[in-house]
Amino acid sequence: MGQSASTTTAVQNHIHHSRSKSRSTGVISPMKENEDSEDVIDVFEVGEFDYSSNIPDECVASIFQSLSSGDRKRCSLVCRRWFRIEGQSRHRLSLNAQSDLASVIPSIFSRFDSVTKLALKCDRRSTSIGDDALVLISQGCRNLTRLKLRTCREITDAGIEAFAKNCTGLKKLSCGLCSFGAKGMNAVLDNCSSLEELSVKRLRGITDGAAAEPIGPGIAAASLRVICLKELYNGQCFGPLIIGSKNLRTLKLFRCSGDWDRLLEAIADQVSEVVEVHLERLQVSDIGLAALSKCSNLEILHLVKTPECTNFGLVAVAEHCKLLRKLHIDGWKTNRISDEGLISVAKHCPNLQELVLIGVNPTRASLEKLAANCLNLERLALCGSDTVGDPELSCIAAKCIALRKLCIKSCPVSDQGMEALASGCPNLVKVKVKKCRLVTSEAADRLRTTRGSLAVNLDANEPEIPDASTSDCVANEVGQENRQMASQVGGSANIALSNTGRSNSFKARLGLITGRNLMACTFRRWSSFGGSFSSRNN
């Protein structure tokens, strides 16, 4: 009784939501079929027939998949059979990776022996699990395909190397605020031949400067499709990996120090099939953009706070990347990208569907060209633009026939411009106006009355937001996509105090309240109307 009860309680204490705190647990052992338990009991009295016994295990597991995490836990306590099925049908685990997790790892993975997606997250103020615990996990999860490590600072190169040798089928690795370095990363690349997605943030073990050990390419280079590097002091050491990933489709570089022009030139010469590039707060100039223009299949480009990029670089991209569908530019109010670059985009990129301009000052000249040539333009966001007033909004209303979603923020438009939308943009379904102080609620009400099917969101009194980055918006979209994908994976479920969807929804609301960026609220609200700004949406 006591042993089994402590087993269930200890395991559930460690299985948690990413922001929950766990309690320390003692040594436990997994429940066995012949053990009595006060937590797991057979609810059917003697002489009663258990009609669920005729339902195959696979059907019971399928039913469990449609339940929330809490309901699954409660169902697992109905009887020993359901307890066993619920554990075996779990494919996703999120664990509090504090050091005391090591003692219960055998019990956890004895019950949950079908896990393919694992998240290990530790609080920054706590001591994380070390190499021995990671090796135990790799021995219990040989079929692991996805691993997320957060703030696991006690894991070294040796632990990652042992893990990579045991979990050779890994397809996705995401690590942040960890202490291992190039040796551990190379071990993953040398052993995981199926690796498709790699995301690295603040990897502390990478040596800065000329002595940095190069990373990659390894056998994983042949399968890699997505590489994302964030806040690395010496991200250029990943150059051999990026250049060697011939099948790379998506490259995201966020706030990585160093000059990236030369590396982008080498990448463009060797990796020509890239379709999506994100550059945020990066030291890159028109030289780097000119290099990217060699990627003729480029469809999605985000330039966020790259002040050395000018019209010259954007023109080069537009002239050679004619398949461009989504363009996000945060000009940081430097006025180095203006009508000249946008007119070139309008001239050479007829497939453009989504345009986001932050801190850029387009005029009617470029907007008319975009409306006339980009007939598939469905989503337009203009934020912090001093030149977008009523004439420009009237131009958009009259000429952007395909436009479905429009966001105007911190622009000098008034009620007159809103009235133009009443008779323009016949396909418009969503309008969002924020911090445009000349627009009144009466104008918004008139627009709602005139076009009953149009969703109008007016917020003129929101406090100023200091930052204007689109990266958080992208992260929220990717998170939404991951939740949709997870719901389609057989038997997948997060073991948490609350489900993942609830967690991400809370994070989204929190990000909106605190005003972390200028565009996050726009896309988050737009997505609720059935549209997605996801960079992966085709």
Predicted regions, residues:
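N-terminal adaptor-interaction module of cullin-RING ubiquitin ligase components
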Residues: 1-164, 169-226, 236-243, 250, ...
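LRR/LRR-like solenoid scaffold signature
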Residues: 120, 149, 175, 200, ...
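Ankyrin-repeat and related helical/solenoid repeat scaffolds used for protein-protein interactions
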Residues: 375, 379-452
